[in-house]
């Protein structure tokens, strides 16, 4: 599972600046949940091929009466859920009582913690850091987050070694890691091959489909989970997954195996109403990372919120297949239903490839139809398409709509091949293809989707240009060119 790093510290010590600095390595703030956690932001970053989730917690204060009393519950939860904690202090302001209170709390938590002294630009670092060694947290990493100084050393010396160990340890886990190992092997296989392979050692359709049921609190995720399990009347048992938070529940339907990833935990149907469904952003993000298909549950009576759109954006950025379930559809008037459909068309137009189902998890109406779309999305995401087929589709798209001129020259697209699966990746080779405008790239993506009939999964297109073999070579004259040049020079001398 993807490791989690929490940034903690007093207010205004530069946590958000470091958060932006780290997430900009991926050039995106992947998940921000406004209104849900006012003092926390979530980002997904990639450094040297290692991915991790970063939490920017709110400032912790109130050391006068003890940090346990005044530390925000969200920040406490972030520390508990994190694998690595970066404790930021202000080197300019010096050691403060709140810093000592936070350090005391962190020493009592069994988490790998690094002390990071920010705002060290323009000051004597050794003098400024002397007092902070009394916190008893070991080595101090001086940085200037606003300018990026020291951040690379922090990444190389602190984060990458721990993240690497975390990933290796997870590979030694059992049960669920067998499926994860398959997908890792499949991705490595896809990077090495640029031509279609006739022989496939792995058939994705024989593996269980990992299905993550995600959504805001109280939209009916657990009710839907229990309904999907109860319909099949199978023996359900809890299978602890690779994380502390998610429960993996195997089930079977129509001869096909599934693994439901329940972020809220499994509860008996009779107790669902008695328990307040808790929402953990970290659980949800990790479930999305680990699944093949994400089932996003939306409350029809509350409409689409910013949290729904944030989750949707994270699913798309992660390249996961998507099915949307609009729950609590029962009991609504026809007029209200039409309004909900109009709102969905307006706000979800950018994910028109995803199937939308109107269901009632409580009564079971429409739930059975979800599996057809889940299977369709998974099949489209893992389907093999040959180079000849992709190249033919590319030529058809080019014939229907010629690419624009770039610096007075026509872009030449030579051939296309599969660059990966889950999500499907199409790699197009040619001249100046990377300079194509975004509008034409969207046209190509939609053309491939329409022709291949890809539903339920995003499709990505990558462009590669061939290098000019003569770019670094001097022009060498042929023998005839040399003789011609000599005659020309002799003629010029005579004319003078």
Swiss-Prot record:
Please list the residues that bind GTP 1.
Answer: 9-16, 56-60, 118-121
Q: Which domain of life is it from?
A: Bacteria
Positions of GTP 2 binding: 215-222, 262-266, 327-330
Q: Which cysteines are joined by disulfide bonds?
A: none
> Is Phosphoprotein set as a keyword in this record?
no
Q: Can you state the subunit structure given in the record?
A: Associates with the 50S ribosomal subunit.
Instruction: Report the protein's function.
Output: GTPase that plays an essential role in the late steps of ribosome biogenesis.
- The entry's protein name is GTPase Der
The species is: Proteus mirabilis (strain HI4320)
Tell me what gene encodes this: der
């Amino acid at each position: 599972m993807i490791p989690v790093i929490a940034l903690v510290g007093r207010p205004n010590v530069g946590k958000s600046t470091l958060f932006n600095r780290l997430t900009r390595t991926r050039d995106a703030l992947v998940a921000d949940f406004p209104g849900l956690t006012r003092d926390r932001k979530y980002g997904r970053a990639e450094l040297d091929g290692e991915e991790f989730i970063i939490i920017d917690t709110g400032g912790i204060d109130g050391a006068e009466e003890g940090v346990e009393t005044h530390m925000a519950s969200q920040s406490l939860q972030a520390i508990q859920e994190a694998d690595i904690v970066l404790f930021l202090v202000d080197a300019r302001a010096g050691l403060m009582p709140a810093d000592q209170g936070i350090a005391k709390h962190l020493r009592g938590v069994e988490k790998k913690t690094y002390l990071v002294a920010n705002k060290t630009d323009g000051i004597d670092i050794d003098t400024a850091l002397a007092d902070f060694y009394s916190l008893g947290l070991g080595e101090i990493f001086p940085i200037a987050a606003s300018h990026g100084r020291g951040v690379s050393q922090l990444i190389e010396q602190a984060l990458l070694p721990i993240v690497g160990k975390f990933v290796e340890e997870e590979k030694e886990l059992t049960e669920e890691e067998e499926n994860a190992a398959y997908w890792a092997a499949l991705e490595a296989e896809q990077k090495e091959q640029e031509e279609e392979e006739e022989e496939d050692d792995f058939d994705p359709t024989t593996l269980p489909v990992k299905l993550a049921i995600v959504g805001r609190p109280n939209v009916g995720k657990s009710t839907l989970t229990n309904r999907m399990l109860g319909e099949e009347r199978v023996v359900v048992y809890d299978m602890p997954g690779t994380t502390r938070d998610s429960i993996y529940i195997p089930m079977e339907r129509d001869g096909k195996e599934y693994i439901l990833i329940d972020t809220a935990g499994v509860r008996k149907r009779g107790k669902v109403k008695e328990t307040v469904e808790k929402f953990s952003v970290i659980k949800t993000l990790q479930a999305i990372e680990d699944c093949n298909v994400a089932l996003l549950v939306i409350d029809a009576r509350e409409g689409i919120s910013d949290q729904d759109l944030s989750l949707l954006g994270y699913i798309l950025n992660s390249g996961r297949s998507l099915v949307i379930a609009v729950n609590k559809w029962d009991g609504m008037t026809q007029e209200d239903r039409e309004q909900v459909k109009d709102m969905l068309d307006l706000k979800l137009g950018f994910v028109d490839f995803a199937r939308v189902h109107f269901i009632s998890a409580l009564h079971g109406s429409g739930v059975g139809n979800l599996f057809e779309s889940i299977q369709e999305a998974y099949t489209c995401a893992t389907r093999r398409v040959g180079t000849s087929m992709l190249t033919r589709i590319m030529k058809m798209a080019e014939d229907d709509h010629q690419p624009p001129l770039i610096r007075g020259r026509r872009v030449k697209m030579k051939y296309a091949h599969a660059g990966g699966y889950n999500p499907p990746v199409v790699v197009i080779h040619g001249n100046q293809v990377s300079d194509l405008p975004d509008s034409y790239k969207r046209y190509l993506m939609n053309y491939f989707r329409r022709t291949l009939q890809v539903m339920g999964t995003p499709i990505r297109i990558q462009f590669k240009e061939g290098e000019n073999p003569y770019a670094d070579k001097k022009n060498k004259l042929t023998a005839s060119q040399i003789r011609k040049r000599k005659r020309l020079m002799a003629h010029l001398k005579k004319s003078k």
